[in-house]
Amino acid sequence: MREIVHLQTGQCGNQIGAAFWQTISGEHGLDSNGVYNGTSELQLERMSVYFNEASGNKYVPRAVLVDLEPGTMDAVRAGPFGQLFRPDNFVFGQSGAGNNWAKGHYTEGAELVDQVLDVVRREAEGCDCLQGFQITHSLGGGTGAGMGTLLISKIREEFPDRMMATFSVVPSPKVSDTVVEPYNATLSVHQLVENSDETFCIDNEALYDICMRTLKLSNPSYGDLNYLVSAVMSGVTTCLRFPGQLNSDLRKLAVNMVPFPRLHFFMVGFAPLTSRGAHSFRAVSVPELTQQMFDPKNMMAASDFRNGRYLTCSAIFRGKVAMKEVEDQMRNVQNKNSSYFVEWIPNNIQTALCAIPPRDLKMSSTFIGNSTSIQELFKRVGEQFTAMFRRKAFLHWYTGEGMDEMEFTEAESNMNDLVSEYQQYQDAGIDEEEEEYEEEAPVDEPLE
């Protein structure tokens, strides 16, 4: 089966990762020790995508847990599903990265990276046909951002033809954990643009908004946020984990979603939104799911797609859903909102179906969109970056670890380029292109 190796780095990555494994273990009928006691053949059919089968009907996640300090790892190990993971797959340092990207990427992280790669290699060798890697991390810190991107580039070197998907928590406009977040995030995006095949952008602020506005939680905890993220991750990976009519793998997803190699940053959404522990007793219908899924309030990244246009998007429906109904709804959305879709990619909504719904829901849908409005997110981080970098504030923390100012300048301009590329395709129409060609045709002068 087409296996995926999962890595989680840093505090954020490990917490999201732990929530993800808890969610999919439940969906596949595994208890907290990885013992199968499910009811459906379908749960077992593609179990091997994420789990290794060990002796005694026990399944072990193909996961590598990485951090530069032992704290979060201990918490995961002590958590409800801590016994699920293979003990050798916990790789951690003692020093911490102190929210410093340079420590994660160049000094502390670089010392630990070979140990991690050994574990990754061992996991990859245990696969029949590895399709790729997925990594959960945040872009604002030191370990997830710095060491996470280091791992991505190292894995890229060693497995150049395998897919690399990242679930990246991007800094949010209002909620900031550290002052140097814009630095860390910009340096990370600089890496992701080059080395990742698909990046699912998740944003704490958007998650807070969903918790407060939609789920009416007065003070959401990180547990509530991680629950939302794990719902989306479970949805995005559904097609990989269960047999379905329209199945996809990481590569098919990328082929359908990425029209230009650098523009692989996706917004994600999920419907119906329910809070942790609350079951939705209301029956949901396909039209409702579709409407909710395309609602900007449901997006888990703080950028509003109405300020841009969709290059491509993909919807994954789960549960007992009629294919015909889904296709009608999708066509409906596209016709009604045609101004939000670029007209030079016809039929740019792709749908997939899976018969197995998430736990406690009759049906659900997950949305993945490649929208030019994601540039708002990069713009915002870029502006904060420039404000600090112009004064060279906090730079000594990075140069002290051996970084060069030049690298900051490069990262800044790469991010600005990314923003203008999104803008360029947002403005592009069909007719403009043709006019340009007509103008260029009659030029016969020899080139100097």
From Swiss-Prot:
Binding of Mg(2+), residues: 69
rRNA-binding listed as a keyword: no
InterPro entries: Beta-tubulin_BS, Beta_tubulin, Tub_FtsZ_C, Tubulin, Tubulin/FtsZ-like_C, Tubulin/FtsZ_2-layer-sand-dom, Tubulin/FtsZ_GTPase_sf, Tubulin_C
Biased composition (Acidic residues): 429-448
Keywords of this entry: Cytoplasm, Cytoskeleton, GTP-binding, Magnesium, Metal-binding, Microtubule, Nucleotide-binding
Binding-site list for GTP: 11, 69, 138, 142-144, 204, 226
PROSITE patterns: TUBULIN, TUBULIN_B_AUTOREG
4Fe-4S in keyword set: no
Main localization category: cytoplasm
Molecular-function GO terms, alphabetical: GTP binding; GTPase activity; metal ion binding; structural constituent of cytoskeleton
GO aspect biological process, one term: microtubule-based process
Region (Disordered): 426-448
Cofactor(s) the protein requires to work: Mg(2+)
GO CC term, one of those recorded: cytoplasm
Localisation per UniProt entry: Cytoplasm, Cytoskeleton
Residue ranges of coiled coil: none
Its biological purpose: Tubulin is the major constituent of microtubules, a cylinder consisting of laterally associated linear protofilaments composed of alpha- and beta-tubulin heterodimers. Microtubules grow by the addition of GTP-tubulin dimers to the microtubule end, where a stabilizing cap forms. Below the cap, tubulin dimers are in GDP-bound state, owing to GTPase activity of alpha-tubulin.
Family (UniProt): Belongs to the tubulin family.
PANTHER family given in the database record: TUBULIN (PTHR11588)
Quaternary structure and interacting proteins, as annotated: Dimer of alpha and beta chains. A typical microtubule is a hollow water-filled tube with an outer diameter of 25 nm and an inner diameter of 15 nM. Alpha-beta heterodimers associate head-to-tail to form protofilaments running lengthwise along the microtubule wall with the beta-tubulin subunit facing the microtubule plus end conferring a structural polarity. Microtubules usually have 13 protofilaments but different protofilament numbers can be found in some organisms and specialized cells.
Stated name of the protein: Tubulin beta chain
Organism the protein comes from: Epichloe coenophiala (Tall fescue endophyte fungus)
